[in-house]
Regions:
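Solvent-exposed interaction patches of small proteins and small membrane subunits
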Residues: 1-126
């Protein structure tokens, strides 16, 4: 991976983490009932999940292969589900994603980011 690709990948991983943190802020102190009745939050969280999926789709295949235990296809699949669900988000599925999948994803992305940043520091100049 070139230095430019590495820098772009690191920025993408940081953007995923920032988006996860936004989701955390959006749903802070909410239960499912509050969430399902709050159209703005449902829309914002759905959009954030779409963004994460889109970033994942553009990560280098080399990185995805190296971290093959990460459910990259499922992450992008959720993005597709939300984007193509024209008649409104499935609140149950979004709630499940933000309470079960996103919390598991955050430490994984943090670890990958840490490793990629460490690798960047040890890369030889081009």
């Amino acid at each position: 991976m070139s230095k430019k690709q590495k820098r772009s990948t690191i920025n993408d991983l940081k953007n995923i983490l920032e988006t996860i943190e936004k989701i955390d802020r959006f749903i802070e102190n909410m239960d499912f009932e509050d969430f399902s009745e709050d159209e703005k939050t449902l829309f914002a969280v759905s959009k954030a999940i779409e963004i994460i999926g889109e970033i994942v789709n553009h990560l280098p295949q080399e990185l995805k292969d190296r971290y093959s235990l990460v459910p990259w296809e499922d992450i992008y699949g959720m993005r597709n589900f939300l984007v193509h669900n024209y008649f409104g988000s499935d609140q149950d599925e979004v709630w499940k994603t933000i309470n079960e999948d996103i919390p598991d994803l955050k430490p994984i992305i943090q670890k990958i980011l840490s490793e990629e940043m460490k690798d960047k520091q040890t890369d030889k100049p081009e």
